Amino acid sequence: LSHYVTDREYTMARRSIAHLIMHPTWPTEWILLTPRMAWLDYLYTGDRRMLEHYYQDLVAKTFHALRDERGLISTRTGLLTREVCASVHFRGRGLRDIVDWPQGGAAGIEKESEGEADGHEMRDVNMVVNAYHYDALRMMSKIAGALGNEEDSLRFCQMAERTAQSINSLLWDQKRGAYVDGEGSSHCSQHSSMFPLAFGLVPQDRIQRTAEYVQSRGMACSVYGAQFLLDALYEAQQDEAALQLMAGTGLRSWYNMISMGSTITTEAWDKVFKPNLDWNHAWGAAAANLIGRRLMGITPLKPGFEEIDIQPQPGGLEYAYIKHPSPRGSIHLKMKRQPDGRYHLDLYIPANSRARLTLPTTKQTLTLLPGRHHVRE
């Protein structure tokens, strides 16, 4: 995703998605992410050929074959057969849930660490896995709709709604304002609430409490998990909290990677959490897309940036500027905070496009045509 936000030529990222479709690795959740990756590729490129070519593969990646009558999935109840593994092109052994990495205790390989999953209890019906399942179904509904398959689009939408209903009735802890780790668990890891919040699964009347719980845990996840933690906070309009985590200087921070002497993002926050960490790892680069997509708020509203959505969430920043690439030309956004807390914005919208701007403080919405614009709140 960071590639799509920082470049206007997406060949490397597209090749990576195609490879992962045919050669998935072992975590359940990463296979479930495939429909989201394919959908985002379509939004950024405007090219639907990947969706058409891999449609049936993407359907299988939702793991609909693992659903029970409640719309919940599990890899640990006997439904994960060789045939199901073959349908998602998994040829190895040991397909299982991950939640976060590295894992600790009996579930993990890294015995030196307690793991980065905030004590998550690995239950048969796993909250995190089912949040991913819900998201995969939502993405498939959008993909089917984009391809004109309205019957499939409705079916996947209804399946997602059923999954959401079960999660919200069975796995919500009203007293703590958070989701439990799975069926039969009383533990609430940060992950069990940040993933449903990031994926839009949390009902409107629970968003504030869920966000407060997630925020109260700090950065209780790995750098991989940080992508979803910060997405969750931005989804809940907690932009100042997200900014503080992104700009943090503790052990779990991008600042710490620099302090260790690395010139490329690393696999883990620090060798304390993973002594054999990679010193060049793509998932460590989440901040690259979070700044563009969330802090500056620039995303494609229509495929190929035919229409651009700009919803800045600057937190307490005084000044920010970005030159965001797109296939139609660069999008420029400069924000300067005024003494009254409101912002002055300078924007450039490329030719053959238009933008929907939501102002950061007043939340007023404006439509911008190609060219330069100066906007005062």
Could you say what each language-model-derived stretch is?
Residues 1-7, 34-50, 132-150, 194-204, ...:
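Well-ordered alpha-helical scaffold segments within catalytic/enzyme domains
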Residues 3-7, 24, 28, 44, ...:
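Hydrophobic alpha-helical scaffolding
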Residues 4-15, 29-32, 44-129, 147-193, ...:
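Active-site acid/base region of carbohydrate-active enzymes
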Residues 16-20, 176, 207-213:
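Flexible, solvent-exposed coil segments and beta strand-coil junctions
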Residues 21-25, 183-184, 212-220, 248-252:
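Solenoid-like repeat scaffolds
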Residues 85-88, 96-123, 177-182, 210-217, ...:
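Short beta-alpha connecting loops at secondary-structure transitions
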Residues 158, 165, 240-377:
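Non-catalytic C-terminal accessory modules of carbohydrate-active enzymes
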Residues 187-192, 220-226:
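Generic helix N-cap/helix-start motif at coil->alpha-helix transitions
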